[in-house]
Amino acid sequence: QLLQIFAGVRPVSALVPGVLGTTGVESAEIVQSVVEATRPDRVVVVDALAAGSADRLCRVIQVTDAGIVPGSGVGNSRAAFSAETLGVPVVAVGAPTVMDARQPGEQEPLMVTPRDVDARVRRLSSLISAGINAALFPDWSYDEIAQFVDL
């Protein structure tokens, strides 16, 4: 049955570049190198975001063609992922998993997450993955996508 599902499927690559603190290399530099080598039609970038209010924490998913600047929501901006920097259209997908809870008058940021953030991130990642698969493979049914995504 898998061969039948994959018949006629467009080629798609996946990459998890890691973060600078782990790899020693900017994520955008890794992605840029892969883009130059593989020449994709577009790049889909997924990242965590910072929420402006608690009611949005792990409850919304943002999709944009404007790109994304990792770390910008927590004051640690890294190199941008955008059409300008990568040379191909970029679809950026993100969900807010942290927020700044500093009190008025405090200078230092206080980043907080929900107590059950791990479970929420697992659910968000399943939803985002299903959405990306539905967009990339519009002929697939919900059941076919669910075979590959924990829905």
Question: What kind of feature is each model-predicted range?
Answer:
Residues 1-14:
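Glycine-rich phosphate/diphosphate-binding loop of Rossmann-like nucleotide-binding domains
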Residues 14, 24, 32, 80-82, ...:
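Non-transmembrane, aqueous-exposed alpha-helical and coiled segments at domain scale
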Residues 15-16, 45-47, 92-96:
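Short beta-strand segments
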Residues 21:
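Metallocofactor- and cofactor-centric catalytic cores in central/energy metabolism, strongly enriched
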Residues 26-30, 38, 119-127:
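Conserved active-site and cofactor/substrate-binding residues in soluble primary-metabolism enzymes
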Residues 29-79:
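Glycine-rich phosphate-binding loop
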Residues 60-115:
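Glycine-rich phosphate/nucleotide-binding loop
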Residues 91-151:
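C-terminal functional extensions of proteins
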